[in-house]
Amino acid sequence: MVAQVRMGVRVLVPLGRSKTYTAMAMRLHSDKPEFETRPIIQVIDAEPVLIEQQLRLWQWISTYYMSPIGDVFKAALPAGLKAEENYRPKTVRCVTLPANLRSEQSLHMALTILKRALKQHQTFSTYLQLSHWSEIDGETPPEHIAEIACDELQNAANASDAVLRQLIQRNFLELYHREVGRLNTSGEYHPERIQPLSPAQHAAEDSIQEQFNEKNVVLLHGVTSSGKTEIYIHLIKKALDDGKQVLYLLPEIALTVQMTRRLQNVFGSRLGIYHSKYSDAERVEIWKKQLSSEPYDVILGARSAVFLPFTRLGLVIVDEEHETSFKQQDPAPRYHARSTAIMLARMYEGAKVLLGTATPSMESYHNACTGKYGYVQLTTRYKNVAMPEIRVVDTKDLYHRKMMRGAFSPDLLEAMRTALSNKKQVLLFQNRRGFAPMVECKVCGWVPKCKNCDVSLTYHRSMNMLTCHYCGYTYPVPKQCPNCESTELLGRGYGTEKIEDRVRELFPEARIARMDLDTTRSAGAYGRIIDDFSCGRTDILIGTQMITKGLDFSGVTVVGILNADTMLNYPDFRAYEQAFQMLSQVSGRAGRRDERGLVILQTKSADLPVIQQVVAGDFQTFAHDLLEERSMFRYPPFYHLVYVYLRHRNEQLVDSAAIEMASRLRQAFADRVLGPDKPAVARVKTESIRKIVIKLEQGINLPLARQCMAEARTQLLQDKRYAAMTVFFDVDPS
């Protein structure tokens, strides 16, 4: 068995009396370990399921993000590769001729016998027609005798299961199961379908190629609808012409649905798709194909696609690089796909990374301004289509004058009416799902809260339930207030469900759809909603941040941002950055073809500089002001941030542990440590949470800093009082 163990193969190891775990052979050595070992009882793989570059990347993720390598292993591998019995190849029931019937004489005899059973005779004759038996000469080797899927034969012959079963039992047909792939590998490569670039796009592509000669990472900063995707397609073709593979990362699965069609139209079966909406078995097959002699040349996927094996990676594209969705939150490893993709490219000689966005993250923009990254700008929309008009509506004044109709201002309603009368489409953005963000007693002000978490419950009218968006727990809606027994319980605020309800009242003739987490849970839901809107089968699409991220809808002329204040008032140092990005991105969905779009931006904070900068499309001024603040108050990109979280069911215990942990950290980092403090949501899933912030200046010895943090955690957990405490680090939080 020792000879079978190689780097990258899976092995089975017994832990305890009855548990067996799948482990990965990471390194072969003869050093005596400092811990008790367990014997390997089975080597699962004949060939490695991981390659050297993956192992190195996983080790980097484990080290940089301070996460156990086992957590990286669990996050990276599809579940079907974690234990051999979890994955089963997909098979199809097929029939073929038994060996004793593969001659004209024996077939003639079989048909004669079957004349007494008319339906069996018809089904057997249909098999011979489908298999083109009459065209096969007597010299055809047995393995080339046609095999027909049972479903195909039964449909063609209109035969029941019983008829087919009788033919098999009487040995007129032979049944077997043929292994088939779950993946769609159809479609030819059509480079001639690639659209020619405009002069501005051509200049941008040339500049990217030129800067790739000196820089490994280039930031493409192009306004919305400037044609960045077409530049990506040209760069992908060049990489394929050079015999290289391409990884194309997108932040949302919804985007991969629309992008898949564009890329498949050109790259056909050379394109593979990888994200969490695929079944586990499909992801296993993609993984195995990437290890085969004929892997996909282009992989399009969400953040987990960085874990796939590549043998000749040449280009990584991170589209919408600013998106916080690229950062994994829970569970560990809490990696950022953008940083991980850059590190992945370093594992391959000559591989380059292109970051694309209309609204760069402060980290990427700062790296471009300081020369660490290359920088290319696209300042005009494709075909010189005008940027949308952004009209700010001060809802504070309108609410005071009682001119609002629910969440809708007169300006927005008028714009929607005009668009619909002109057979155009409307996009409405509300970044809260559910019907009402909270329910409140009109008499005493009681608000129902989650019993597990420190949050109010959201009312979902479609289920008639109150739901916690943190732990998922649901509660029936009370008939009366438990505090004062009043029956006047009112929904406060507007979720996407309530907006949809109001829009149906205001525009009863319009075809309306909603796109949020609740409507996209089922397989194919993303595709159906996007298809219907793209093809004009939907007039008004209401959505959360899912609709802000790079989707391309040609018929949209009006975008309504119902409440910009929820983004601006979030208690986080990135709130304005993310608000600018989201508002600019959703505005960019308007007027992407021939007609100038209109954006109605509703806010009670119309005078804020960030709102004015969104209206003017003035990213440079916004970034300059924000970077000055970040530098002054010691935030990224000038400082590294590490959040230390402590969680436990006993609030007093987590308080004392947090104080002690902060004290230990201050011994190493002095005034770089802030806290402990309660986060915005201080209890989740019955556990109280405390947070410590560590700010580390650029140039600090990060390996030593990580060592000090890890030692502080180890020392804390050695105290018996805190042995059951959960303590983890969030490096570079988003």
Language model features with spans:
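Well-ordered beta-strand positions enriched in small/hydrophobic/aromatic, beta-favoring residues
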Residues: 11, 92-95, 123, 390, ...
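A general secondary-structure junction signal
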Residues: 27-29, 77, 177-179, 430-432, ...
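Short helix/strand-capping connector loops at secondary-structure junctions
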Residues: 38, 689-690
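A short catalytic or substrate-binding loop motif that flags glycine-/basic-rich loops and adjacent residues
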Residues: 17, 433, 686
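Accessory, non-ATPase domains that flank or precede helicase/AAA+ motor cores in DNA-metabolism machines
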Residues: 1-354, 371-385, 668, 702-734
